[in-house]
Amino acid sequence: MAQFELSPRRLMQMEQGLAALETSPIGAHAFAFFSPDEVASLIKAAQKLPYRRAKSSAGNNVSQDFDICFPAPRERQFDACADLLERAFAHCLEQQPDLFDAAIELNDFAVQLYPKGSTGIGIHRDAKRYRNIVCVITLAGMSDFFISADRDGQGRVDIDDSPGNLLLLAAPGFRGLADPALRPLHGVDNIAAGRLSIGFRMG
């Protein structure tokens, strides 16, 4: 299969993934979606990007220990990846017109690079301005992405965002998120072997 091809199998994976997200009590769901060759091509593209150090604290005193490229250029492999996701979401929206409150346009793109031993990013919610769906794709490394019930980390649930998986988070406008205030609290820690991840959002 060509890289980032929208195959019938992928459409089924996305349909099932969004159905699982809609019924998830934690507002997050991850599932296998990308091939090793696709992940490798994204890693290669990410290695060419310019990074800057993220602020050590953001929002509600959320700790941050990583380098970031933002806004990252949606070009080449990144654009092919985003286009694949947009077309898959469009298919699902066509089947279920009330799934999202608008067609998905992934116009907010960031790449994050966590060094080995990083403290990660503290528990936080994505900003309200991000609509419908948040896509996180880990490309390399060993770390823990988790959802928690509160900012103290109670009720923690680790999510398998291994390279090749697509992690979806519910955002305002998604049918499965009844209350925008209940956007999932999440964070990243236990950066045992570094972490390289990309995030697509609809701003």
Q: Whereabouts are the PLM-identified features?
A:
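Short, well-ordered beta-strand micro-motif
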Residues: 30-32, 138, 168, 199
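A short, structural micro-pattern
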Residues: 6, 105, 131, 139, ...
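Non-heme Fe(II)/2-oxoglutarate
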Residues: 4-99
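Catalytic core of Fe(II)/2-oxoglutarate
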Residues: 146-203
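A general structural signal for short secondary-structure junctions and capping/turn motifs
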Residues: 20-22, 101, 127, 136, ...
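Conserved double-stranded beta-helix
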Residues: 62-144
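A broadly conserved detector of short glycine/acidic/proline-rich loop/turn motifs that flank catalytic sites
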Residues: 33-38, 115, 127, 141-143, ...
